[in-house]
């Protein structure tokens, strides 16, 4: 089994898993804390519009996906601020519009879009050197941004109204974080696809949240959890010859419930010990 480690494509996959774990730990902690998971799902699915347009007009589908994810995120934010539009309705509108545009342009594109399943469901084993270089740059920038402006980001994530009373540039940081979310979603499309990418921005953070409370600790723990999820999914995909994206998500959910069970057992043991001492 360990012989698979000698293959270049698998080494690329491992490096991609590491970079995405670092990237999604930062962005996902903000997404979960700010309760933007559904909005993130809307941005991810809206990015299909850019993939379809890229195939039709002949430019990079990933570039189109990034543009649509960013516009989708800003559109969701703008609509949600309207008094006559519910936030979940805004997400549904952008979500379905982006996917519809993507389907139409993919259908109209000359020939058959053979790599469409890769964008939908992901394939971490198809990551190239150029993908890793772009993801490395994005990860380095995101880590710097989050640790340089940690106090502001945490305040905006937990209580944006309080942040405004402190004179913090809430709107500017919300826009910047929306841009980073969009780029993160696109950067992880190769791994798990449009349909599942939001899971990388939420499940490791939920697992970390079982044991930690502070934002910084959530980021650090979810880095480890996310990498373990990706490793487990990679090897499961190799052993069973099944799609890697789905395998990663299945492993992450299983580990979440395993961690939840362990926490419950430890809590009961602690409570029982305390009761006996009394």
Kindly label every feature range from the protein language model.
Residues 7-12, 83, 87, 91-151, ...:
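Transmembrane helix-bundle core of multi-pass membrane transporters
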Residues 18, 22-26, 67-75, 101, ...:
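Generic alpha-helical transmembrane segments of integral inner-membrane proteins
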Residues 131-204:
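Helix-loop-helix "hairpin" substructures at the membrane interface of multi-pass membrane proteins
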Residues 242-278:
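Cytosolic-side transmembrane-helix boundaries in multi-pass membrane proteins
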